[in-house]
Amino acid sequence: RKLPQPEIKSILWNPSEIGFNGKGYRDPATGFSFNTLNRMGDIFIIKSIINTRIEQVQNYLKYSNDDQKPGYQIRYKQSPGSVGDKDKKELSDKDKKIVDYIVKFLEEGGENEKWDCEDNFQEFTRKVLNDSLRLDQMCFEVVRSRDLKLKKFRAVDGALIRQLDTNDPRYAQMFEQFRWHGYLPRYAMVWDGQIIRHPVTGEYVAFYPWELGYGIRNKTTNVFKNGYGCSELETLVEIVTWILWGMQYNGNFFKQGSQPKGFINVKNGNIDQGTLNEFRQDWKQTMSTVYNSHKIPVVQGIDLEWIDLQKNNRDMEFTEWVKFLLVIACAVYRMDPSELGFQFEDAARIFGQEGQKERLDHSKQKGLTPLLVFYQNVINKY
């Protein structure tokens, strides 16, 4: 008698039936929609962080035979027990032709004609990493032949992709009619709460596991995430809000112009309007324009009092507060603020010029290298 194969018993999704929407797919139960995260990604500081990291990745998207230069390589997979170059398998002439084909395939977006409107490797990477750094969801369609050989790939809007209920044992039976090659579809494109139908065929736009490249950087065991990741922007919601409030507060200073340095209080209660108008005109002629800056006015016959509205150092506190928020935003994305061009005097004073270089290298090892490894693993998988 054949013994039953052991299976995993644990669950990955919210066990409550409340999370089941009956539409065939799961939404990320985070409280923030993908559209909200995309709008946050368009805010200047977040966009600067994301674009900077993507531009750094671009340096590694050209094929390189030199281990010391940035770029990617195509080689035989090495066994865990291999040591150094002595166990590295040399490429034959046939292998080199295969490498040339793979490089061309990547850089042209698949087996496309010259004038097909498909992305090259650099453009493709910009799109999928932008989604990953905003939504923590990288998605791209993979087109294969009948024998499942790779033919094309195309970046897909990650905000439209949802995980189907097919890998939830409670609802998998609903999809049995779609089983193919022993697998059920795993992802679908969703718009306005409904799975999209193809405009030509009328079929649901659903993807089997080998038809959609799918990558999550910040995976979690939290069942309330419903199998989705956790975007950095979810962590930064309050920080980004405070940055916007600070910028709005400072912008209103120039927009409304209602923050004078102080007031002149005329103490003479019985002064006539003519004298007051004459004083106002003399003051304007004597003190206005840049040429009269720092002049000392001399006034006779009028008892005046200056009420200063800028006796405190709130401006300095405001600057430090915004600086602190920017540092927090960069820290969540594992990036040093100096990579964005922010040169803080206190940091330069502490670390010096050599220390600054070490900080940049450390920042790239902490943020750029893990992103490259993640991207490499996703590309190799599909």
Task: Walk through the language-model features, giving the residues of each.
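Structured, contiguous alpha/beta core segments that scaffold functional sites
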Residues: 1-317, 323-324, 328-332
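Short, surface-exposed loop/turn motifs that are enriched in glycine and acidic residues
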Residues: 269, 311-319, 349-361, 365
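Short acidic alpha-helical/loop segments enriched in Asp/Glu that coordinate divalent cations
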Residues: 295-297, 335-348, 377-382
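Long, compositionally biased
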Residues: 357-382
